[in-house]
């Protein structure tokens, strides 16, 4: 028998600035299923992760909430840990990048790279927010992508085309913090000489470490020539200060992947059988796998292996990349209630429903996965309740009633037993290659055969016939053994169901090799329902709750749209000054263009007991003035009449907006009457 494999597995680090949602959970569930399969096979498989806890976003959010960054990341880590645990994601260690292990390793890798000549320093022209008084990190600049012209993209990479670029390459930049137009200032920065590793990366990315589609995408970047990577940020910044460089900090993407190493090192201190160097030293025989989303491929498949190579550590065995999650065929939407937080899901549905559905749809590629909620309900109910659990519920009662819960010896269906045994290697290969969808299809095909065989034998009918009790017991014992096989095959996906089934079967925790054996002359525990059907009403309630989450978040947070920066609040006034302005509801009786005036409309306003003539510069936003007629608006009624070239204007209507087409005439709520005072 071969020696157990030594395997270290990571998932991408969730950012410590927000809640986990179902899109995130796709990756952690996928990774957890693969890890559980390896452990089920008897391999030494260690699964580590951490919160990504550095960067300007965390610093600014903590400032906004009036707490320290350390308090913020501690709060978020507690929330993340709870969500992962309740989704049955079983990390061996869930750490934080804001740790002493990560500080030490980041400093070590940097100094090794520096001493080997892989770090350059030079002055860069960098964006500075004059309103906030700080240099802007890449994620706090937004503008138009210089590669594909997609708007509203971040300052370091484009979410549409995947390109990376310097913030100064971004077109039409704006500060995402204040809305101000940033100004350019010079600053001394530190660069990782990524081009030093061009040849190594061209070979490594084509060595089977990546899916073909990912390697092909990386080839585009490699063929165009790699650029030096800016790894420093200026104070103020929440992160690790670069050794020997006061006021300069490591860019979050430098120390984030080092967080994998730090989390493992933290675990090694508590698990003496684990040796850090055995997994991370150059020439290590252990296997190292990263599971990530396709949006961060460049960091994990270019920068990260180059950093490891240059600092004397081993490179990953493979980087496994998955696509995004869509819901009902579209991008997750807060307004439609399909942007579903992990906790919102858990408040309404069992975690294993989603674990199974993800498994059933996950392949080896990088295609997006669609969570179709109607199909989700149908598939879980049909496969798990209608097929797998149904076998045990059909057979258990007859064994308890007819033989005091003891399974008889013998094999009532040798051909079926052989088919289940023969399927195991293919199912194992599907798990190993992360082709979870194929594994689920093959498992459910076995469940279909088992159910068809039981239905054909119909023990419920035989139980009513004299002299058929031995046959009933043989059929049901066979059914329970087939159910046990299915539980073993599904255990990486459904650990809770497996644990409940093990309790019913009265057996120790099952391993993969247990599929080679049978239960005979074995006492079962009383059967209890192992899984209930999904009620569509619970899915609808989850969607409604997700919409409520959005409304609650909007109620708590200011718009943050930078309007007050562009047009600051005026100086305070006394109440009497405000009270001197007579605001009234007005009905627009007539609205027409003014001949010879480019911007003006002439409005006839009814304010209850009299009519007013008002000229207003809103023509650019209302090219068809007749559409304003019959509409209520608000006006300043005691403004001194003003003589104009086109006539006398007897007041002013109220509108918002910067001008041009963006002028928005204000209206009172329904029920207001012309002439009523606004107060």
Swiss-Prot record:
Its EC number is 6.1.1.10. The keyword Zinc applies. It is an enzyme of class 6 (ligase). Residues 577-679 form the tRNA-binding domain. The keyword RNA-binding applies. Its cofactor is Zn(2+). GO terms for molecular function: ATP binding; metal ion binding; methionine-tRNA ligase activity; tRNA binding. Disulfide bonds: none annotated. ATP binds at residue 334. One of its GO terms (biological process) is methionyl-tRNA aminoacylation. Is required not only for elongation of protein synthesis but also for the initiation of all mRNA translation through initiator tRNA(fMet) aminoacylation. NCBIfam families: metG, metG_C_term, PRK00133.1. Belongs to the class-I aminoacyl-tRNA synthetase family. MetG type 1 subfamily. This is Methionine--tRNA ligase. It comes from Pseudomonas entomophila (strain L48). The lineage of its organism: Bacteria, Pseudomonadati, Pseudomonadota, Gammaproteobacteria, Pseudomonadales. The gene is metG.
């Amino acid at each position: 028998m071969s020696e157990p494999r030594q395997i270290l597995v990571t998932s991408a680090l969730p950012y410590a600035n927000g809640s986990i949602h179902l899109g995130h959970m796709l990756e952690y569930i996928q990774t957890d299923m693969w890890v559980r399969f390896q452990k089920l096979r008897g391999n030494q498989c260690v699964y580590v992760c951490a919160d990504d806890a550095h960067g300007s976003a965390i610093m600014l959010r903590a400032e906004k909430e009036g707490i320290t960054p350390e308090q913020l990341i501690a709060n978020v880590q507690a929330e993340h840990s709870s969500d992962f645990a309740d989704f049955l994601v079983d990390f061996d260690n869930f750490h934080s990048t804001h740790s002493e292990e990560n500080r030490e390793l980041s400093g070590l890798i940097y100094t090794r790279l520096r001493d080997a000549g892989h770090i350059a320093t030079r002055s860069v022209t960098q964006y500075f927010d004059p309103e906030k008084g700080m240099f802007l990190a890449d994620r706090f600049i937004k503008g138009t992508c210089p590669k594909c012209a997609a708007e509203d993209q971040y300052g370091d990479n484009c979410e549409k085309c995947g390109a990376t670029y310097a913030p100064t390459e971004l077109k039409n930049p704006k500060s995402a913090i204040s809305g101000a137009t940033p100004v350019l200032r010079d600053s001394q920065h530190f660069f990782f000489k990524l081009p030093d590793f061009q040849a190594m990366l061209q070979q490594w990315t084509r060595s089977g470490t990546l899916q073909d589609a990912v390697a092909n995408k990386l080839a585009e970047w490699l063929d165009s020539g790699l650029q030096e990577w800016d790894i420093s940020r200026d104070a103020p910044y929440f992160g690790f200060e670069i050794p020997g460089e006061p006021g300069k900090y490591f860019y979050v993407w430098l120390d984030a992947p080092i967080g994998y190493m730090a989390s493992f090192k933290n675990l090694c201190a508590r698990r003496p059988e684990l040796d850090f160097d055995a997994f991370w030293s150059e020439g290590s025989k252990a296997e190292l796998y990263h599971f990530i989303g396709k949006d961060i491929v460049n960091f994990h498949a270019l920068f990260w292996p180059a950093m490891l190579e240059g600092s004397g550590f081993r490179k990953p065995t493979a980087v496994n990349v998955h696509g995004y999650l869509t819901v009902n065929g579209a991008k997750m939407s807060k307004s439609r209630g399909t942007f579903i937080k992990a906790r919102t899901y858990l408040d309404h549905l069992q975690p294993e429903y989603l674990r199974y559905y993800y498994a059933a749809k996950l392949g080896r590629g990088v295609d997006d996965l669609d969570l179709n909620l109607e199909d989700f309900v149908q598939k879980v109910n049909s496969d798990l309740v209608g097929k797998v659990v149904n076998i045990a519920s059909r057979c258990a009662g007859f064994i308890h009633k007819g033989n005091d819960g003891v399974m008889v010896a013998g094999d009532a269906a040798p051909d079926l037993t052989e088919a289940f045994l023969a399927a195991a290697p293919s199912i194992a290969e599907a798990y190993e290659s992360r082709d979870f969808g194929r594994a689920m299809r093959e498992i459910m095909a076995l469940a279909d055969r088992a159910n068809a065989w039981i239905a054909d034998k119909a023990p419920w009918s035989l139980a009513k016939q004299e002299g058929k009790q031995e046959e009933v017991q043989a059929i049901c014992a066979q059914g329970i053994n087939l159910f046990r096989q299915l539980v073993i095959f599904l255990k990486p996906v459904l650990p809770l169901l497996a644990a409940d089934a093990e309790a019913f079967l009265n057996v120790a925790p099952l391993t993969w090799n247990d599929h080679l054996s049978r239960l005979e002359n074995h006492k079962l525990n009383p059967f209890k329902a192992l899984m209930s059907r999904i009620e569509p009403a619970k899915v609808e309630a989850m969607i409604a709750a997700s919409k409520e989450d959005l409304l609650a978040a909007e109620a708590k947070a200011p718009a943050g749209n930078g309007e007050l920066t562009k047009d600051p609040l005026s100086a305070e006034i006394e109440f009497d000054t405000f009270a001197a302005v007579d605001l009234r509801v007005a009905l627009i009786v007539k609205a027409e263009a003014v001949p010879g005036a480019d911007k003006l409309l002439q409005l006839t306003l009814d304010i209850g007991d009299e009519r007013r003539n008002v000229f207003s510069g809103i023509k650019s936003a209302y090219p068809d003035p007749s559409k304003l007629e019959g509409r209520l608006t608000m006006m300043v009624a005691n403004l001194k009449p003003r003589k104009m070239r086109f006539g006398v204007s007897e007041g002013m209507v109220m509108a918002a907006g910067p001008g041009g087409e963006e002028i928005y005439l204000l209206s009172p709520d329904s029920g207001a009457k012309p002439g009523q005072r606004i107060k």
